Amino acid sequence: ERRWSVRGLHHENVLPVIGTKELVAWLPTQLGLSSDSTVIVPTTAYPTYRVGAQLARARIVAADHPDQLADSPDPDGSVDLIWINSPANPSGRVMSADELRSWVRYTRRTGAVLVSDECYGEFVWDGKAYSILDDEICGGDHSGLLAAHSLSKRSNMAGYRAGFLAGDETLISELLTVRKHSGLMVSTPVSAAMVAALDDDGHVEVQADRYRRRRGIMMSALQDAGYRIDDSQGSLYLWATCGEDCRATVDRFARLGVLVAPGDFYVAGTSQNVRVGLTASD
């Protein structure tokens, strides 16, 4: 509630996880999805959304708005799980409140589970990032909704493998049962570290200020060199292009001793964008 304007969450609504990568990879399987299931993923996305669906043998459909699903798949019942990500990896795009509400309405209509990956939500540079659990988005009804959060980004705790899932109490209870019998419990020391980090807002502001400074420097340098920055309203990345194939841009940066990620790692097919991280030390 303090950070995200989400009310009505109790311990029954929260599930600690061993880092959100593990969660993303195994959630479709833990929800009981199979070859008869359909998973919606963003068109430009973290690859593990697709990997998780593949592990469950589920069908994968890429879409960024419910309107894109009017014809395929059947909008009235064949969708089982929807992933959204705002601010997004790799593009840094921040979804509007109206977009999020559209996904909630679609979820209510289809009976799907909607999971919002909000791991970069503490780092928004333009506009505002909303949680899917915000009353303004879901009307106070968390049924069918889950929000994923990670301490790797907000608290620089990647090595701890610490995150949590929050939302629908029934889904959380079912996942808790499956996960504890699978040995996927967060250790007591890591749990204590999570509590300490989540109780402290000061270090998050320090992190955000550091990334904001780096972002300003990197944006200016890229734009001066002729690059265009697409989206990038949030997250820890700049989604940059100079209008050539992304692999040529990767090579161009490599000759300068700079490592960037090719856009075709995140999209099906070709891409002209590269992901430029803001996480290298000053």
Model-identified regions with their sequence ranges:
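Helix C-cap/helix->beta junction micro-motif
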Residues: 56, 109-110, 225, 256
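Conserved core of the PLP fold type I
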Residues: 1-105, 122-123, 127-140, 146
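Conserved glycine-rich beta-strand-loop-beta hairpin in the small C-terminal domain of fold type I
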Residues: 191, 195, 211-219, 228-241, ...
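Hydrophobic residues in well-ordered beta-strands that form the structural core
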Residues: 41, 62, 116, 186, ...
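Conserved core segment of the aminotransferase class I/II
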Residues: 136-212
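Conserved PLP-binding active-site segment of the aspartate aminotransferase-like
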Residues: 167, 237-244, 256-282
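Short, conserved charged micro-motifs
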Residues: 245-252
